[in-house]
UniProtKB/Swiss-Prot annotation:
One biological process term in Gene Ontology: L-histidine catabolic process to glutamate and formate
Organism this protein belongs to: Ruegeria pomeroyi (strain ATCC 700808 / DSM 15171 / DSS-3)
Name of the encoding gene: hutH
Pathway membership, UniProt: Amino-acid degradation; L-histidine degradation into L-glutamate; N-formimidoyl-L-glutamate from L-histidine: step 1/3
Reactions listed under catalytic activity: L-histidine = trans-urocanate + NH4(+)
Protein name as it appears in the record: Histidine ammonia-lyase
Pfam families: Lyase_aromatic
PANTHER family from the UniProt entry: HISTIDINE AMMONIA-LYASE
Length: 512
Protein backbone atom coordinates (compact mmCIF):
# COMPACT_ATOMS: atom_id res chain seq x y z
CA UNK A 1 0.00 0.00 0.00
CA UNK A 2 1.37 3.41 -0.99
CA UNK A 3 2.20 5.63 1.96
CA UNK A 4 0.23 8.81 2.50
CA UNK A 5 2.46 11.87 2.61
CA UNK A 6 0.95 14.24 5.14
CA UNK A 7 1.74 17.93 5.28
CA UNK A 8 1.35 19.24 8.86
CA UNK A 9 -1.43 21.80 8.87
CA UNK A 10 -3.07 20.37 5.72
CA UNK A 11 -4.25 16.84 6.57
CA UNK A 12 -7.84 16.22 5.49
CA UNK A 13 -10.73 14.18 6.86
CA UNK A 14 -10.28 11.88 3.87
CA UNK A 15 -6.64 11.26 4.85
CA UNK A 16 -7.61 10.54 8.43
CA UNK A 17 -10.43 8.19 7.44
CA UNK A 18 -8.01 6.19 5.27
CA UNK A 19 -5.58 5.95 8.18
CA UNK A 20 -8.33 4.81 10.55
CA UNK A 21 -10.25 2.37 8.34
CA UNK A 22 -7.49 1.10 6.04
CA UNK A 23 -4.47 1.62 8.33
CA UNK A 24 -2.70 3.36 5.45
CA UNK A 25 1.04 3.83 6.01
CA UNK A 26 2.03 7.46 6.52
CA UNK A 27 5.03 9.74 6.37
CA UNK A 28 5.40 13.43 7.08
CA UNK A 29 6.33 15.70 4.22
CA UNK A 30 10.09 16.22 4.75
CA UNK A 31 9.59 19.88 3.85
CA UNK A 32 8.51 20.44 7.46
CA UNK A 33 11.90 19.32 8.81
CA UNK A 34 13.70 22.72 8.80
CA UNK A 35 11.01 24.32 10.96
CA UNK A 36 11.07 21.35 13.35
CA UNK A 37 14.84 21.52 13.73
CA UNK A 38 14.86 25.30 14.16
CA UNK A 39 12.36 25.03 17.02
CA UNK A 40 14.44 22.27 18.63
CA UNK A 41 17.52 24.49 18.49
CA UNK A 42 15.58 27.31 20.13
CA UNK A 43 14.58 24.98 22.98
CA UNK A 44 18.16 23.76 23.47
CA UNK A 45 19.32 27.35 23.77
CA UNK A 46 16.64 28.08 26.36
CA UNK A 47 17.63 24.99 28.35
CA UNK A 48 21.19 26.24 28.59
CA UNK A 49 20.12 29.68 29.79
CA UNK A 50 19.08 31.07 33.16
CA UNK A 51 15.59 32.32 32.25
CA UNK A 52 12.88 29.94 33.55
CA UNK A 53 10.96 28.36 30.67
CA UNK A 54 8.08 26.09 31.64
CA UNK A 55 8.81 22.43 31.08
CA UNK A 56 12.30 23.14 29.75
CA UNK A 57 14.13 23.97 32.97
CA UNK A 58 11.24 23.95 35.47
CA UNK A 59 8.93 21.45 37.07
CA UNK A 60 5.42 20.77 35.78
CA UNK A 61 1.90 21.84 36.69
CA UNK A 62 1.78 23.14 40.26
CA UNK A 63 5.57 22.61 40.41
CA UNK A 64 6.27 25.05 37.56
CA UNK A 65 8.01 27.53 39.86
CA UNK A 66 10.74 25.03 40.79
CA UNK A 67 13.95 25.43 38.75
CA UNK A 68 15.72 22.35 37.34
CA UNK A 69 19.47 22.33 36.70
CA UNK A 70 20.65 21.89 33.06
CA UNK A 71 22.34 18.58 33.87
CA UNK A 72 19.01 17.21 35.08
CA UNK A 73 16.87 18.02 32.03
CA UNK A 74 17.04 14.49 30.57
CA UNK A 75 16.03 12.99 33.92
CA UNK A 76 13.26 15.59 34.19
CA UNK A 77 11.75 14.51 30.87
CA UNK A 78 12.06 10.78 31.57
CA UNK A 79 10.51 11.21 35.02
CA UNK A 80 7.67 13.17 33.44
CA UNK A 81 6.78 10.31 31.12
CA UNK A 82 7.05 7.56 33.72
CA UNK A 83 5.13 9.46 36.40
CA UNK A 84 2.31 10.27 33.97
CA UNK A 85 1.79 6.65 32.90
CA UNK A 86 -1.23 6.34 35.19
CA UNK A 87 -3.88 5.15 32.75
CA UNK A 88 -6.27 2.39 33.74
CA UNK A 89 -8.71 0.10 31.98
CA UNK A 90 -8.56 -1.93 28.81
CA UNK A 91 -6.06 -1.05 26.06
CA UNK A 92 -7.50 1.06 23.28
CA UNK A 93 -7.95 -0.62 19.87
CA UNK A 94 -4.87 -0.87 17.70
CA UNK A 95 -6.27 1.31 14.92
CA UNK A 96 -7.13 4.00 17.48
CA UNK A 97 -3.58 3.99 18.83
CA UNK A 98 -2.22 4.31 15.30
CA UNK A 99 -4.51 7.24 14.52
CA UNK A 100 -3.41 8.87 17.76
CA UNK A 101 0.26 8.45 16.74
CA UNK A 102 -0.40 10.03 13.35
CA UNK A 103 -2.15 12.98 14.97
CA UNK A 104 0.85 13.49 17.24
CA UNK A 105 3.14 13.45 14.19
CA UNK A 106 0.99 16.14 12.57
CA UNK A 107 1.17 18.29 15.69
CA UNK A 108 4.92 17.94 16.16
CA UNK A 109 5.46 18.55 12.46
CA UNK A 110 4.12 22.08 12.75
CA UNK A 111 7.53 23.12 14.08
CA UNK A 112 6.25 24.74 17.25
CA UNK A 113 7.03 22.01 19.79
CA UNK A 114 10.83 21.93 19.83
CA UNK A 115 11.44 18.20 19.42
CA UNK A 116 14.30 16.75 17.42
CA UNK A 117 13.60 15.25 14.00
CA UNK A 118 14.98 11.94 15.28
CA UNK A 119 11.93 11.54 17.52
CA UNK A 120 9.56 12.17 14.63
CA UNK A 121 11.48 9.60 12.60
CA UNK A 122 11.19 7.01 15.38
CA UNK A 123 7.44 7.56 15.71
CA UNK A 124 7.07 7.18 11.94
CA UNK A 125 9.13 3.99 12.01
CA UNK A 126 7.03 2.56 14.83
CA UNK A 127 3.97 3.04 12.62
CA UNK A 128 5.72 1.57 9.58
CA UNK A 129 7.03 -1.48 11.47
CA UNK A 130 3.81 -2.13 13.37
CA UNK A 131 4.99 -1.25 16.88
CA UNK A 132 1.81 -0.09 18.60
CA UNK A 133 1.97 1.24 22.18
CA UNK A 134 -0.43 -0.30 24.70
CA UNK A 135 -2.55 2.64 25.89
CA UNK A 136 -5.18 2.26 28.64
CA UNK A 137 -8.52 3.83 27.78
CA UNK A 138 -9.15 5.74 31.02
CA UNK A 139 -7.25 8.51 32.76
CA UNK A 140 -7.54 11.70 30.71
CA UNK A 141 -9.66 14.74 31.59
CA UNK A 142 -8.79 16.52 28.35
CA UNK A 143 -6.52 19.22 29.88
CA UNK A 144 -3.56 19.70 30.25
CA UNK A 145 -3.90 17.59 27.18
CA UNK A 146 -4.47 13.84 27.20
CA UNK A 147 -1.58 13.40 29.62
CA UNK A 148 -1.85 9.78 30.75
CA UNK A 149 -2.69 8.22 27.35
CA UNK A 150 0.04 10.18 25.59
CA UNK A 151 2.52 9.25 28.31
CA UNK A 152 1.81 5.56 27.67
CA UNK A 153 2.40 6.17 23.96
CA UNK A 154 5.65 8.04 24.62
CA UNK A 155 6.94 5.49 27.13
CA UNK A 156 7.68 3.07 24.30
CA UNK A 157 9.80 5.70 22.55
CA UNK A 158 12.11 5.82 25.58
CA UNK A 159 12.16 2.02 25.94
CA UNK A 160 9.60 1.77 28.74
CA UNK A 161 5.92 0.87 28.84
CA UNK A 162 4.40 -1.83 26.67
CA UNK A 163 3.72 -2.27 22.98
CA UNK A 164 2.09 -4.75 20.65
CA UNK A 165 4.32 -6.17 17.94
CA UNK A 166 3.28 -8.87 15.48
CA UNK A 167 0.32 -9.77 17.66
CA UNK A 168 2.32 -10.03 20.90
CA UNK A 169 2.14 -7.71 23.89
CA UNK A 170 5.72 -6.99 24.91
CA UNK A 171 7.78 -4.63 27.08
CA UNK A 172 8.35 -1.46 25.08
CA UNK A 173 12.12 -1.93 24.76
CA UNK A 174 11.69 -5.50 23.52
CA UNK A 175 9.06 -4.50 20.96
CA UNK A 176 11.38 -1.84 19.57
CA UNK A 177 14.32 -4.25 19.47
CA UNK A 178 12.36 -6.92 17.61
CA UNK A 179 11.35 -4.28 15.06
CA UNK A 180 14.96 -3.19 14.65
CA UNK A 181 14.46 0.13 16.41
CA UNK A 182 16.33 1.83 19.25
CA UNK A 183 14.84 3.92 22.09
CA UNK A 184 15.76 7.60 22.28
CA UNK A 185 16.55 9.51 25.46
CA UNK A 186 14.48 12.68 25.63
CA UNK A 187 16.05 16.11 25.51
CA UNK A 188 14.76 19.43 26.87
CA UNK A 189 10.96 19.76 26.70
CA UNK A 190 10.57 16.71 24.46
CA UNK A 191 8.63 14.66 26.97
CA UNK A 192 6.29 17.58 27.58
CA UNK A 193 5.83 18.07 23.83
CA UNK A 194 4.70 14.47 23.47
CA UNK A 195 2.20 14.36 26.34
CA UNK A 196 0.74 17.85 26.02
CA UNK A 197 -1.87 17.55 23.30
CA UNK A 198 -5.37 16.43 22.42
CA UNK A 199 -4.49 13.49 20.18
CA UNK A 200 -6.20 10.79 22.28
CA UNK A 201 -9.49 12.71 22.46
CA UNK A 202 -9.28 13.75 18.83
CA UNK A 203 -8.62 10.19 17.62
CA UNK A 204 -11.68 8.84 19.43
CA UNK A 205 -13.80 11.79 18.30
CA UNK A 206 -12.76 11.26 14.68
CA UNK A 207 -13.55 7.55 14.88
CA UNK A 208 -16.95 8.42 16.35
CA UNK A 209 -17.52 10.95 13.60
CA UNK A 210 -16.68 8.50 10.82
CA UNK A 211 -18.94 5.85 12.34
CA UNK A 212 -21.75 8.34 12.91
CA UNK A 213 -21.66 9.59 9.33
CA UNK A 214 -21.77 6.08 7.89
CA UNK A 215 -24.66 5.23 10.21
CA UNK A 216 -26.50 8.45 9.34
CA UNK A 217 -26.31 7.83 5.61
CA UNK A 218 -27.22 4.15 6.09
CA UNK A 219 -30.24 5.28 8.11
CA UNK A 220 -31.59 7.02 5.01
CA UNK A 221 -31.69 3.61 3.32
CA UNK A 222 -33.43 1.89 6.24
CA UNK A 223 -35.77 4.89 6.55
CA UNK A 224 -36.75 4.66 2.89
CA UNK A 225 -37.37 0.92 3.29
CA UNK A 226 -39.55 1.55 6.34
CA UNK A 227 -41.48 4.26 4.50
CA UNK A 228 -42.34 1.85 1.70
CA UNK A 229 -43.03 -1.02 4.11
CA UNK A 230 -45.82 0.94 5.85
CA UNK A 231 -46.92 2.48 2.52
CA UNK A 232 -45.94 5.93 3.66
CA UNK A 233 -46.31 9.04 1.55
CA UNK A 234 -43.43 10.59 -0.36
CA UNK A 235 -45.20 13.95 -0.56
CA UNK A 236 -43.25 15.31 2.45
CA UNK A 237 -40.06 14.69 0.46
CA UNK A 238 -40.93 17.23 -2.24
CA UNK A 239 -37.93 19.51 -2.81
CA UNK A 240 -39.94 22.73 -2.59
CA UNK A 241 -40.77 22.03 1.06
CA UNK A 242 -37.12 21.72 2.03
CA UNK A 243 -35.93 24.60 -0.13
CA UNK A 244 -38.32 26.87 1.76
CA UNK A 245 -36.48 26.03 4.98
CA UNK A 246 -33.00 26.06 3.53
CA UNK A 247 -30.99 23.71 5.75
CA UNK A 248 -28.47 21.76 3.68
CA UNK A 249 -28.78 18.52 5.64
CA UNK A 250 -32.57 18.50 5.36
CA UNK A 251 -32.44 19.25 1.63
CA UNK A 252 -29.86 16.51 1.07
CA UNK A 253 -31.70 13.91 3.17
CA UNK A 254 -34.97 14.51 1.31
CA UNK A 255 -33.20 14.28 -2.06
CA UNK A 256 -31.53 10.98 -1.13
CA UNK A 257 -34.80 9.50 0.07
CA UNK A 258 -36.60 10.60 -3.11
CA UNK A 259 -33.90 8.89 -5.15
CA UNK A 260 -34.07 5.74 -3.04
CA UNK A 261 -37.86 5.48 -3.42
CA UNK A 262 -37.99 6.44 -7.08
CA UNK A 263 -39.83 3.83 -9.16
CA UNK A 264 -41.43 1.97 -6.25
CA UNK A 265 -44.59 0.09 -7.27
CA UNK A 266 -45.62 0.07 -3.63
CA UNK A 267 -45.61 3.86 -3.55
CA UNK A 268 -47.54 4.18 -6.81
CA UNK A 269 -50.20 1.74 -5.59
CA UNK A 270 -51.52 4.16 -2.96
CA UNK A 271 -50.67 7.54 -4.45
CA UNK A 272 -54.37 8.08 -5.22
CA UNK A 273 -57.27 7.37 -2.87
CA UNK A 274 -55.24 6.86 0.32
CA UNK A 275 -57.53 7.61 3.27
CA UNK A 276 -54.60 8.68 5.44
CA UNK A 277 -54.01 12.42 5.30
CA UNK A 278 -50.65 12.53 7.07
CA UNK A 279 -48.11 9.98 8.27
CA UNK A 280 -46.71 10.02 11.83
CA UNK A 281 -43.72 12.26 12.43
CA UNK A 282 -41.21 9.40 12.29
CA UNK A 283 -42.12 9.04 8.60
CA UNK A 284 -43.12 12.60 7.67
CA UNK A 285 -40.26 14.42 9.42
CA UNK A 286 -37.36 12.16 8.50
CA UNK A 287 -35.46 14.77 6.44
CA UNK A 288 -35.88 17.36 9.18
CA UNK A 289 -34.51 15.05 11.89
CA UNK A 290 -31.82 13.07 10.07
CA UNK A 291 -30.86 16.10 8.00
CA UNK A 292 -30.36 18.18 11.13
CA UNK A 293 -28.17 15.42 12.57
CA UNK A 294 -26.11 15.38 9.38
CA UNK A 295 -25.63 19.15 9.59
CA UNK A 296 -24.41 18.76 13.18
CA UNK A 297 -21.97 16.05 12.09
CA UNK A 298 -20.60 18.33 9.39
CA UNK A 299 -20.10 21.04 11.99
CA UNK A 300 -18.22 18.60 14.22
CA UNK A 301 -16.17 17.47 11.21
CA UNK A 302 -14.99 21.01 10.57
CA UNK A 303 -13.85 21.36 14.19
CA UNK A 304 -12.05 18.03 14.23
CA UNK A 305 -10.25 18.60 10.94
CA UNK A 306 -8.87 21.85 12.33
CA UNK A 307 -7.87 20.12 15.58
CA UNK A 308 -6.16 17.27 13.75
CA UNK A 309 -3.82 19.82 12.19
CA UNK A 310 -3.27 21.92 15.29
CA UNK A 311 -0.20 22.48 17.43
CA UNK A 312 -1.63 21.61 20.85
CA UNK A 313 1.55 21.68 22.89
CA UNK A 314 2.65 24.02 25.69
CA UNK A 315 4.78 26.06 25.70
CA UNK A 316 5.01 26.76 21.98
CA UNK A 317 7.95 28.04 19.98
CA UNK A 318 6.83 31.10 18.02
CA UNK A 319 9.41 31.16 15.24
CA UNK A 320 8.73 34.58 13.75
CA UNK A 321 8.72 36.28 17.14
CA UNK A 322 11.68 34.17 18.35
CA UNK A 323 9.80 33.45 21.58
CA UNK A 324 8.80 30.48 23.70
CA UNK A 325 5.37 31.24 25.14
CA UNK A 326 3.14 29.38 27.59
CA UNK A 327 -0.46 29.08 26.45
CA UNK A 328 -3.40 26.72 26.60
CA UNK A 329 -3.72 24.97 23.23
CA UNK A 330 -3.69 21.64 25.09
CA UNK A 331 -7.22 22.35 26.39
CA UNK A 332 -9.52 20.02 24.44
CA UNK A 333 -12.69 22.11 24.76
CA UNK A 334 -13.26 22.22 20.97
CA UNK A 335 -12.98 18.43 20.82
CA UNK A 336 -15.31 18.09 23.80
CA UNK A 337 -17.96 20.22 22.12
CA UNK A 338 -17.59 18.27 18.88
CA UNK A 339 -17.94 14.95 20.72
CA UNK A 340 -21.09 16.16 22.46
CA UNK A 341 -22.57 17.22 19.12
CA UNK A 342 -21.79 13.83 17.58
CA UNK A 343 -23.41 12.12 20.57
CA UNK A 344 -26.59 14.17 20.16
CA UNK A 345 -26.75 13.29 16.46
CA UNK A 346 -26.28 9.58 17.18
CA UNK A 347 -29.01 9.65 19.80
CA UNK A 348 -31.55 11.38 17.56
CA UNK A 349 -30.90 9.19 14.52
CA UNK A 350 -31.49 6.16 16.73
CA UNK A 351 -34.57 7.68 18.37
CA UNK A 352 -36.43 8.27 15.11
CA UNK A 353 -35.33 4.90 13.71
CA UNK A 354 -36.68 3.17 16.80
CA UNK A 355 -40.05 4.84 16.27
CA UNK A 356 -40.14 3.53 12.71
CA UNK A 357 -39.49 0.02 14.03
CA UNK A 358 -42.31 0.45 16.54
CA UNK A 359 -44.61 1.62 13.74
CA UNK A 360 -43.92 -1.43 11.58
CA UNK A 361 -44.61 -4.02 14.29
CA UNK A 362 -47.87 -2.38 15.43
CA UNK A 363 -50.81 -3.57 13.27
CA UNK A 364 -52.87 -0.51 14.23
CA UNK A 365 -50.26 1.79 12.64
CA UNK A 366 -48.52 -0.27 9.94
CA UNK A 367 -51.30 -0.12 7.30
CA UNK A 368 -52.23 -3.79 7.18
CA UNK A 369 -48.92 -5.43 8.00
CA UNK A 370 -49.39 -8.45 10.30
CA UNK A 371 -48.63 -8.06 14.03
CA UNK A 372 -44.88 -8.10 14.68
CA UNK A 373 -44.29 -8.88 11.01
CA UNK A 374 -44.87 -12.62 11.30
CA UNK A 375 -47.14 -14.60 8.92
CA UNK A 376 -48.66 -16.54 11.82
CA UNK A 377 -49.09 -14.19 14.80
CA UNK A 378 -50.04 -15.79 18.09
CA UNK A 379 -48.24 -19.03 17.47
CA UNK A 380 -45.24 -16.88 16.56
CA UNK A 381 -44.02 -13.67 18.20
CA UNK A 382 -42.06 -12.54 15.15
CA UNK A 383 -40.02 -9.39 15.68
CA UNK A 384 -41.72 -8.42 18.93
CA UNK A 385 -38.66 -8.56 21.15
CA UNK A 386 -36.33 -7.25 18.47
CA UNK A 387 -38.32 -4.02 18.76
CA UNK A 388 -37.93 -4.11 22.55
CA UNK A 389 -34.18 -4.43 22.08
CA UNK A 390 -34.17 -1.27 19.98
CA UNK A 391 -36.03 0.53 22.77
CA UNK A 392 -33.33 -0.52 25.25
CA UNK A 393 -30.57 0.64 22.92
CA UNK A 394 -32.33 3.93 22.20
CA UNK A 395 -32.67 4.63 25.91
CA UNK A 396 -29.00 3.83 26.53
CA UNK A 397 -27.91 6.20 23.77
CA UNK A 398 -30.12 8.96 25.16
CA UNK A 399 -28.36 8.59 28.49
CA UNK A 400 -24.93 8.52 26.85
CA UNK A 401 -25.78 11.69 24.91
CA UNK A 402 -25.76 13.81 28.06
CA UNK A 403 -23.03 16.44 27.61
CA UNK A 404 -19.59 15.70 29.00
CA UNK A 405 -17.96 19.05 28.30
CA UNK A 406 -19.97 20.73 31.08
CA UNK A 407 -18.59 18.36 33.72
CA UNK A 408 -15.36 20.16 34.60
CA UNK A 409 -13.50 19.49 37.83
CA UNK A 410 -10.29 21.04 39.26
CA UNK A 411 -7.12 18.93 39.09
CA UNK A 412 -3.40 19.20 39.89
CA UNK A 413 -3.76 21.16 43.13
CA UNK A 414 -6.11 23.64 41.42
CA UNK A 415 -3.49 24.73 38.90
CA UNK A 416 -5.45 22.94 36.18
CA UNK A 417 -8.79 24.13 37.48
CA UNK A 418 -10.96 23.79 34.37
CA UNK A 419 -10.87 20.71 32.16
CA UNK A 420 -12.79 19.61 29.08
CA UNK A 421 -13.63 15.94 29.75
CA UNK A 422 -13.19 15.55 25.99
CA UNK A 423 -11.62 12.12 26.38
CA UNK A 424 -14.65 10.68 28.15
CA UNK A 425 -16.96 12.44 25.71
CA UNK A 426 -15.11 11.01 22.71
CA UNK A 427 -14.62 7.47 24.01
CA UNK A 428 -18.36 6.94 24.64
CA UNK A 429 -19.06 7.57 20.94
CA UNK A 430 -17.85 4.09 20.03
CA UNK A 431 -20.51 2.50 22.22
CA UNK A 432 -23.16 4.83 20.82
CA UNK A 433 -22.24 4.03 17.21
CA UNK A 434 -22.43 0.31 17.99
CA UNK A 435 -25.86 0.75 19.60
CA UNK A 436 -27.07 2.67 16.55
CA UNK A 437 -25.86 -0.10 14.25
CA UNK A 438 -28.06 -2.52 16.18
CA UNK A 439 -31.09 -0.23 16.02
CA UNK A 440 -30.70 0.24 12.28
CA UNK A 441 -30.00 -3.47 11.85
CA UNK A 442 -33.34 -4.32 13.46
CA UNK A 443 -35.02 -1.67 11.31
CA UNK A 444 -33.48 -3.33 8.26
CA UNK A 445 -34.87 -6.72 9.33
CA UNK A 446 -38.33 -5.28 9.96
CA UNK A 447 -38.48 -3.16 6.83
CA UNK A 448 -37.33 -5.99 4.55
CA UNK A 449 -39.98 -8.24 6.06
CA UNK A 450 -42.60 -5.53 5.61
CA UNK A 451 -41.61 -4.90 1.98
CA UNK A 452 -41.99 -8.62 1.25
CA UNK A 453 -45.50 -8.63 2.70
CA UNK A 454 -46.45 -6.10 0.00
CA UNK A 455 -45.78 -8.62 -2.82
CA UNK A 456 -46.53 -8.83 -5.68
CA UNK A 457 -45.85 -5.10 -5.54
CA UNK A 458 -42.16 -4.28 -5.68
CA UNK A 459 -40.20 -1.52 -4.03
CA UNK A 460 -37.69 0.57 -6.01
CA UNK A 461 -34.69 -0.95 -7.75
CA UNK A 462 -32.33 0.65 -5.23
CA UNK A 463 -34.24 -0.66 -2.23
CA UNK A 464 -34.67 -4.11 -3.79
CA UNK A 465 -30.88 -4.26 -3.89
CA UNK A 466 -30.72 -3.43 -0.18
CA UNK A 467 -33.23 -6.18 0.65
CA UNK A 468 -31.35 -8.65 -1.54
CA UNK A 469 -28.10 -7.81 0.27
CA UNK A 470 -29.75 -8.67 3.58
CA UNK A 471 -31.37 -11.82 2.20
CA UNK A 472 -27.98 -13.06 1.01
CA UNK A 473 -27.22 -13.65 4.69
CA UNK A 474 -30.54 -13.58 6.57
CA UNK A 475 -33.57 -15.46 5.20
CA UNK A 476 -37.14 -14.19 5.43
CA UNK A 477 -38.76 -14.84 8.82
CA UNK A 478 -41.51 -17.45 8.37
CA UNK A 479 -41.48 -19.11 11.79
CA UNK A 480 -39.94 -18.02 15.10
CA UNK A 481 -36.25 -18.84 15.31
CA UNK A 482 -33.12 -17.89 17.22
CA UNK A 483 -32.76 -14.21 16.28
CA UNK A 484 -29.64 -12.88 18.01
CA UNK A 485 -27.14 -13.88 15.27
CA UNK A 486 -29.39 -12.34 12.62
CA UNK A 487 -29.47 -9.02 14.45
CA UNK A 488 -25.68 -9.17 14.65
CA UNK A 489 -25.50 -9.80 10.90
CA UNK A 490 -27.86 -6.95 10.04
CA UNK A 491 -25.94 -4.59 12.33
CA UNK A 492 -22.68 -5.65 10.70
CA UNK A 493 -24.07 -4.85 7.25
CA UNK A 494 -25.07 -1.40 8.44
CA UNK A 495 -21.74 -0.73 10.13
CA UNK A 496 -19.73 -1.90 7.13
CA UNK A 497 -21.64 0.38 4.78
CA UNK A 498 -22.94 -2.61 2.80
CA UNK A 499 -26.31 -0.95 2.15
CA UNK A 500 -24.58 2.14 0.77
CA UNK A 501 -22.51 -0.07 -1.54
CA UNK A 502 -25.54 -1.68 -3.22
CA UNK A 503 -28.14 1.08 -3.59
CA UNK A 504 -26.17 2.86 -6.30
CA UNK A 505 -26.86 6.38 -5.02
CA UNK A 506 -24.29 8.95 -3.93
CA UNK A 507 -25.12 9.65 -0.28
CA UNK A 508 -22.93 12.74 0.03
CA UNK A 509 -19.91 13.49 2.19
CA UNK A 510 -18.87 15.07 5.45
CA UNK A 511 -17.29 18.12 3.89
CA UNK A 512 -19.05 21.22 5.30
Amino acid sequence: MTALTLTPGSATLEHLARIYFDESPVRLDPACRPAVEAAAARIRAAAAGDVPVYGVNTGFGKLASLKVAPQDTATLQRNLILSHCCGVGAPIPRRMARLMMVLKLLSLGRGASGVRWELITLLQEMLARDVTPVIPVQGSVGASGDLAPLAHMTAVIIGAGEAEYQGQRLPGAEALARAGLTPIALGPKEGLAFINGTQFSTAFALAGLFGAWRAATSSLVTAALSTDAIMGSTAPLQPEIHALRGHRGQIDAAARMRALLDGSEIRESHREGDTRVQDPYCIRCQPQVTGAAMDVLRQAAQTLEIEANAATDNPLVLAEADMIVSGGNFHAEPVGFAADLIALALSEIGAIAQRRVALMVDPTLSFDLPPFLTPKPGLNSGLMIAEVTTAALMSENKHLANPCVTDSTPTSANQEDHVSMAAHGAVRLGRMVENLHYILGVELLCAAQGIEFRAPLQTSTALQAAVARLRAEVPRLEEDRYMAPEIETAARLVGAGALLDVVGIDMGGLRP
